[in-house]
């Protein structure tokens, strides 16, 4: 019945997958919509002692798709099916019995996934989450492995590499159902030390010139690189704060220019350069106000005067925690600083993906940067 009436209802309004499954489960005297409200409260952590909005963007279809992916994986493992699949038709056909049997373990998978992101990846807020779509395989993988296995160092290392390859390789921007199936099979096998194709890890590529086109937080890779800076314990220039789950909620750092926009415009620096992620970093509001539109040499001096007891050596350490060359910044040497920071960000990306950026000295890189990034 669901498949027949998938496209229109009696009013001619398209029905969502969730509405169709809700109608099917209603024949079993089960209110899926009411159940989803309870599931959403659990996923979002309403009532938690320390709650962030990280998972507030997860909707009912995302949750159903995750339950379907987990169920399909179990079915293949038990020999009931030959493939893992969570496409629209599979979600529509998710049996009521399977939903009831697997819902709670998938909810636990989301909880484990949230801990993984908050604790291990320094992704704290919904606005900083690179992909909501990647949470589907992540939660399903965590549900299969369980909390104890997910907390093992080798598991964290394996899942971290997969997670960052997916983000920095920008692998989850389109139709992803086939990738989800690869991911759950590959990662469970990899964690358990068995051969697998590692589709997402092996397919992920980061190009050096992508740094120039990462200009806004609309990009997953842009958000990802900022999270990597948090993960590396970058410290605020003025108050020395590192960004953790508590500070991200209390002080809400934002992403600002290192060489200020007004200064760059005055100096004739191209927007393609000064507005790229290479010239941006997480900064607290008070520090950003102190920076203003001034040259770095001016605002560094102003910060030293403003913060009691702050030595230049300490300020240098704070600045360099953002992978910024302090000497070049203090000298207002935009070109030297820009190339140096591009290299440092590529090093950070290579570390997260555990694979090399292969075009650091390619002709296209040389053309666009005017120097090798090797």
Model region roles, listed by residue range:
Residues 245-279, 295:
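Histidine-centered nuclease catalytic patch
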Residues 19-22, 50-209:
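A cross-family structural signal marking well-folded subdomains
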Residues 297, 301-336:
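C-terminal structured domain segments
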